[in-house]
Amino acid sequence: LGKMGIPAHAISRTGYFSTQEIQVLLNYLAILDNPRQDIPLASVLTSWFGGLGEEELGYLRAVDKEKPFYENVLAWMSESEEISESISEELRQKLPEEIQEKLARFHQTYQKLRKKSRYLPIHELLYEIFAMTGYLDYVTALPAGGQRRANVEMLIEKAIAFENSSYRGLFHFIRYIEKLQKYDVDFGEAEIVSENDEAVRIMSIHKSKGLEFPICFVA
């Protein structure tokens, strides 16, 4: 329908956590809490945040195959604002300069955000991520950008609701999301179509009970 220029919206109670824009954002939050995680770290580095391609990621992995992937990355992400002086010249020569520059840019933003993550409420941390990386503008510019943006903004709402409970902090929020995923407690994607919008609404027969439509296709 989208390819034909027909506005359409699928109503679902699942699929929120599997959307790319949310997966990447949750992975970024995860490594802000703890960067020693190979899969979330690789996901973030090959996303808008890191800008690395798969081949470049392979170069980074090959720097020292005896160590976990995250250790190779952390060698370039010391607590200082500059790239760690402990990196040997041999390691520098193994990694192309373009990759080093991308890691340096990623490292600079990451370190600032990680410091903020220690005291900011989650929803404010998300706003900081968007302001410093342009992530919200990026997802909005993608195909189906309106839906993607609404999904990201929905995560802010979830963060605010979480902070109104008895728990606080990034660590607890990540554990909360992980528990939802573990027990298959998912959300549908954010609603961006109102009842008065002219668009095709895709839903189950059960969901359509009690509603009236001038035209209906059953498939």
Describe the residue ranges of each PLM region.
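Conserved motor-region signature of P-loop NTPase helicases/translocases
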Residues: 1-63, 94, 100-101, 108, ...
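Accessory alpha-helical DNA-binding modules that contact the DNA backbone or grooves
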Residues: 63-90, 103-106
